């Protein structure tokens, strides 16, 4: 357990930041799931719009250090590929 005042403060800040980051992570995942749901529904235009809405949020999570850059790039790439496959199908 933290003994010095600054260590106690850091422990408080770490807990607060952990909770905040968890909510941001959850929000980003929700946006990704919304895009996936639109893809599974088979609606190309809605899926494209949902991805357009989700991309800036996903990018901001990278800038905040919530997700790794490659993870978000991989998700965006896969979602985009699924949407393109929808259009051709």
From Swiss-Prot:
Keywords annotated in UniProt: Ribonucleoprotein, Ribosomal protein, RNA-binding, rRNA-binding
A biological process from GO: translation
Classification via PANTHER family: 30S RIBOSOMAL PROTEIN S20, SMALL RIBOSOMAL SUBUNIT PROTEIN BS20C
Purpose: Binds directly to 16S ribosomal RNA.
Bias type Basic residues, positions: 7-22
rRNA-binding is among the record's keywords: yes
Family matches, as SUPFAM superfamilies: Ribosomal protein S20
Gene for this chain: rpsT
MF GO annotations: small ribosomal subunit rRNA binding; structural constituent of ribosome
Family: Belongs to the bacterial ribosomal protein bS20 family.
Region of interest (Disordered), residue spans: 1-26
Organism in which the protein naturally occurs: Marinobacter nauticus (strain ATCC 700491 / DSM 11845 / VT8) (Marinobacter aquaeolei)
GO cellular component: cytosol; small ribosomal subunit
Name of the featured protein: Small ribosomal subunit protein bS20
């Amino acid at each position: 357990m933290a003994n010095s005042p600054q260590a106690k403060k850091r422990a408080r800040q770490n807990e607060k930041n952990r909770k905040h980051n968890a909510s941001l992570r959850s929000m980003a995942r929700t946006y990704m799931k919304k895009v996936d749901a639109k893809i599974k529904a088979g609606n190309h235009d809605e899926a494209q719009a949902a991805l357009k809405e989700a991309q800036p949020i996903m990018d901001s999570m990278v800038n905040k250090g919530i997700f790794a850059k490659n993870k978000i790039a991989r998700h965006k790439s896969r979602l985009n590929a699924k949407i393109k496959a929808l259009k051709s199908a």
